[in-house]
């Protein structure tokens, strides 16, 4: 059985832009998303650079209470998914939630949860 996948909307939260428009403009202008690590103290580490998401405020992109309960990487995913739904012209109040989906990739998940138990 052949199955078709249809991409109808896009969303982005990246080191070079927190929306699709910002991301695309960053690509076109050659914006560099790599810089000094700011999310934690790097004194005891050799690596000092990373591609961190900057200037992201989750409570501006989703329900404040929901954002407060989520790890930051989950907030990125929800914000990008909401942008993709809006880009597709979907009103989630009107759509059948069983007919709408999104694919989200995360290479490692929540470092704030992994790091404290890794030593």
Question: PLM features: what roles do these ranges have?
Answer:
Residues 1-119:
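Conserved "HGTGT" condensation-loop signature of ketosynthase/thiolase-family condensing enzymes
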């Amino acid at each position: 059985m052949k199955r078709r996948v249809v991409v109808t909307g896009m969303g982005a939260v990246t080191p070079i832009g927190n929306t699709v428009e910002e991301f695309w403009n960053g690509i076109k202008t050659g914006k560099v998303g790599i810089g000094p690590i700011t999310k934690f103290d790097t004194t005891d580490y050799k690596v000092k650079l990373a591609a961190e998401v900057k200037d992201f405020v989750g409570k501006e992109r989703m329900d404040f209470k929901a954002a407060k309960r989520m790890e930051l990487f989950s907030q990125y995913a929800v914000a990008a998914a909401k942008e993709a739904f809006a880009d597709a012209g979907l009103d989630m109040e009107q759509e059948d939630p069983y007919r709408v989906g999104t694919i989200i990739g995360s290479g490692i998940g929540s470092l704030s949860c992994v790091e404290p138990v890794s030593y």
